[in-house]
Amino acid sequence: PPQGVQVSDDRGPIKNGITTAYAEGASLTLTCSATSGKPLARVSWWKGGELITNETQYFPERKRSQSILKIDKLIRSHLLAVFSCEVSNSQLQPPLVVRVAIDMYLRPLEARLQGLNHPLSAGRRTDITCKCKGSRPPAVISWWK
């Protein structure tokens, strides 16, 4: 059977089953590699029980096979989405499975000013609050004059 399974992205090996954070709109390439095994393993990507790709590249000289999952544009629904890499070279044994979740930065969906429901007057104090929602991590709000 295959001995090792490793998932990596453009930044290197994935640790603790979650990618480093990617910006909304960025592209992401995940590579799942299997080493050893005779014959070399078939490698496939799954999400929620559905096959995404089972296109496997074989490198016999290095005793390795791999499959690449490319997401051209990350969207909000990819946040913490779990993708599974399955590695198998025999129907007699269950596949080796490695799961990876996608971490993301999300820009704010909305910024709103509160407290402007009356006319402003010179020399009179008015409190205005800026509320922001939909960002991850929470947005840093600053005021400029």
List PLM regions with ranges.
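Conserved Ig-like domain signature around the intradomain disulfide
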Residues: 28-30, 41-43, 79-87, 91, ...
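Flexible inter-domain hinge/linker segments at boundaries of tandem extracellular adhesion modules
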Residues: 1-16, 46-53, 62-63, 89-90, ...
